[in-house]
């Protein structure tokens, strides 16, 4: 018998001679193999002389021949782990060298995503990625509009580095590094809009997914990188018009704005219909920031659009205006959130389950002063088991400053209900929806930031009629159900996306429009140091 082949077996047997019968315990690679420390340019390696055999509770129970097979399997497994660790260490060494090489190439310029950028050039033999000049111009136009918005000061500095860098591999590397930043932003801004676009300073450049990078590299290799970059541009025509206007301006400059007129708007989705828009000027930076806020809307073609500071709802079908209505939105301390959802159903004669925040902040203090309002407002007080409770039997004063109350309140359906006659549901983690209101007199006010977050619709009856008609309801059935005061829910058949967004400055039809910044979200916009004339010269 070959003694060399028996050596691993003998080592394995000796290592488990005292092992108890137990499930197999595999030692992680990190324990089985000391790691290699890479300090570019010198690379120190600590490699073991031999790999300790893994303890195996199964081995002592096997026959001698089975033990041989088992020991061989363990040895092969250890060899494979060793080879994989060697490969990983070699890849890490090459990547560290590549990262050092690209940093030396770009000199004092700061890379946003140096490791990911280095890997791209390492995998592609350091060949230039930006030979398509049309792709360069298209990318720089979009990246400049993003950088000017103040969303990412680091991106603005990265753009300026590109503008200052002469042609060559260094500029190519800077372009790739910034493009990775743009890829990540463009892909993720939709789900992070509330933070990135309305809480300036929260965005941080990160690497895009490997799939995105692979798709872009593939387009570079097959000569279609220009089309790849062009496909990243939002199709929203108002976004495109707004960005285009930026390149006719200079930072620090203002542009004249158009005052909205009364009556039905001929423009789409964003213009106020009751003199909400203001005259004056819109700064370069404000316009740049609001252009980014328009990115979250694919197009103004189908769906319900509510630009929160305009106090208007627009319902579009195939690009045509089906309904325009005044709305009431959340007040400053209970803001209507920026969000995207879809209408799921219409509720006729909806009851109102009072949210906890409104219960504790608004209703409990009123009940403490006068429990009788529960009867006048058709409130039902329910305990934790759902049993009705006499409002006069509760000492409401003890809950005036409490964060929670051991009761729920439900308001019965009816014209006097806080939700009015119709509720338009949409899946939302914020419990935000559209609804009617019993107090239509408030729609005559100019400032309509009055609700607790939901959107009250002046023409809710007309909106419900459109949606119910599509569900097969006649006008007679609609009126009959309303009169019955019976709560009825009807699923919506058509696809109706809902966009709640916040834009205070934009360009539409060649005109700049502005709205009051009702939530103070345009204050303290960072003024980036970008050579805008250089930007305009390269795009």
PLM regions: where:
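Gram-negative bacterial Sec-dependent N-terminal signal peptides
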Residues: 1-20
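Cationic-aromatic interfacial patches
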Residues: 21-202
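Phosphate-binding glycine-rich loops and adjacent basic patches that engage nucleotide phosphates
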Residues: 99-106, 137-146, 206, 387, ...
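Eukaryote-specific, cytoplasm-facing alpha-helical/coiled-coil scaffolding segments in long proteins
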Residues: 202-213
